Amino acid sequence: MSIARRTTLSKFLIEQQRETNNLPADLRLLIEVVARACKAISYNVSKGALGDALGTAGSENVQGEVQKKLDILSNEILLDANEWGGNLAAMASEEMETFFPIPANYPRGEYLLVFDPLDGSSNIDVNVSIGTIFSVLRCPDGKQATEESFLQPGTEQVAAGYAVYGPQTVFVLTTGNGVNCFTLDREVGSWVLTQSNMQIPADTREYAINASNARHWYDPVKRYVDELNAGKDGPRGDNFNMRWIASMVADVHRILNRGGIFMYPADKRTPDRPGKLRLMYEANPMSFIVEQAGGAATTGTQRIMEVQPTGLHQRVPVFLGSKNEVERVTGYHDEAK
């Protein structure tokens, strides 16, 4: 592809604004700012030990997880990049206990930005793909946000995306009109459109789950995975392969490209906690992307994007990816009720 014929993220968004007339200018600018912040995060991730950003920071986030230095740095990059542009009323991050209102000395906008600044950060020190996940909502209270302003079901998202910092840095985006992937051209610093209208195959022979937790799973998940593992001699009559990167962005990106099902179920170790992944920061944005690509996403009992949030850091079980497989494991949950 010649440089002159490349479609950059900026050009793509402007063309979308002209063609569909459903991409407001402030939302377009917000997406571009988030994408620029992801470039900065990518740069810091790629420096590794040379940037003195590996290892833990000696602190814990609101979930009680030990924070990596790059967790904190990535969070600061996103806050600093977005607080002054006039597009946002407030932000919320997986790394912060409460939401972040736009300071009074900056103009405020009508949108809310929700993000996981560095998903899969347990993989930082071993150089495995990690990423950033984000979601955009409208502020129902105009420009004066409260915590309640964020507690909207995923169906209210106006944009969602993620960046993967791997062999290439990619930025995957939906604004409710399909899913597109942009690759970072490091030489010129531009996001270049490399995949349009991405679609997840309805059927798959790959699944992603942390099998070390098998002894803790509830019966519907055990049944489903046992059938997959039985291969050609089992009830499915086919062989399936397991893939598990322990980085949601990397696992979902693989599924978006070649199909599969990603599962992070609730289990018996914490019966009072429904799952591990965060609804607002991980499950909702990824579900929006997956559904826009023709896939499905449920908690096992409910469409994820229809869950009514009750708190910023609410957790849910997650089953997402190829539609027929998600519907099958969801059906097993229905049968077990």
Curated annotation (Swiss-Prot):
Cofactor comment text: Binds 2 magnesium ions per subunit.
CDD domains: FBPase
Pfam families for the chain: FBPase, FBPase_C
GO molecular function: fructose 1,6-bisphosphate 1-phosphatase activity; magnesium ion binding
Family annotation (SUPFAM superfamilies): Carbohydrate phosphatase (SSF56655)
Positions annotated to bind Mg(2+) 2: 116, 119, 282
Protein family membership: Belongs to the FBPase class 1 family.
Subunit structure: Homotetramer.
Protein name: Fructose-1,6-bisphosphatase class 1
Organism lineage: Bacteria, Pseudomonadati, Pseudomonadota, Betaproteobacteria, Burkholderiales
Gene: fbp
